[in-house]
Amino acid sequence: MLTLYNARSIITMNESLPRASAVLVRDGMIIEVGEPERMEPWLRHEEYVVDDRFAEQVICPGFIDPHLHPSMAAVLLPMEFITAMRWKLPWGEVQPVTDSDGFDERMAALSDMKGVGEPLFIWGYHQLWHGPMSRARIETVTGDKPTVVWHRSFHEVYMNAAAMDMIGVVAAEIKPGMQIDIERGWFFEGGLGYAISRLNPWILAPEQYAAGLQRLKQVVHSGGHTTIGDLATGMFNLTAEAEALSQHLEGDDVSFRTRLVAHGTVLTKGGVPPQQGPELAEALLQRNSHRLHFGRHIKLFSDGAFFSQLAQLQAPGYIDGHHGEWLSTPEVLEQHIRSYWYAGYQIHVHV
């Protein structure tokens, strides 16, 4: 069955036909865009209905954000923002903070607004504007109030001693190579996973996470996006994320679709051989619904975040001489890639 949608005007964003007045659809797929009379060859051969709900309105294409991370957004959007850039959000505007003194002043003000023992989560820190961060610096500002400062890249986080005690960081568990500097309260790249596993009771608390997903829906809708991509489903907790996304991003009040791409190394953590990854990824297809869809895609990670200056660079490298960090060494990454490649998966790699 065809449906012919009439509109006052359709902005196609196609130079060959910038404007039209009708769009013909079959089973959710656009068959043709143009003027109704041009669609007669289709209409003569198939049953169709005319839908005039947009007859007095202008239709324009929705945008696609292929790399959004809705779970990450749901975690950070409820946080307090201290960033070097202005953020215009549906619920308010955040003014930029571009120096270290301003960052500390804002952090102190936010700390004063929190109740005794109530943790403070801050997102948006970046060393190029806000200077070096450390446990000692945070404690100078917020004292023994549990405080978590998340880097702009999201690939690293800093905590004071109170926050580390709150989430149960055990110094004796920290081994060389874990990408954790316990003295600085710094958890980066692979070490971020250690921190997240202990932060999950706070950042994935049902009410908190649901509020974050509601904010995500507002942001996506206000930006005119009709499709987004989650390029690392499971980065926090695969089961919890999948269930929450199904609850909050599937329904008539959701104005967009989400393509889900699983975090490949999460599927095979705990000693599961990479060769079993495709089988585990295939099982996720059973979760597909109208707005949430896993495909034969997988996300893998190579090196650190560019925003954090932890990406691996070839010569001449970083000006100060430091080196980036591996999330997966080339040898390990190759094992995962080959497993999914031979299983026919499209592979997305963070580099």
Identify the residue ranges that each predicted region occupies.
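Accessory "access/gating" subregions that flank catalytic or transport cores
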Residues: Q286-S289
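Flexible, glycine/threonine-enriched loop-and-boundary segments that flank and lead into catalytic domains
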Residues: P278-A283
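Divalent metal-binding segments
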Residues: L2-N6, I11, E15-R26, I30-Q276, ...
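A conserved non-catalytic segment of reverse transcriptases
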Residues: S302
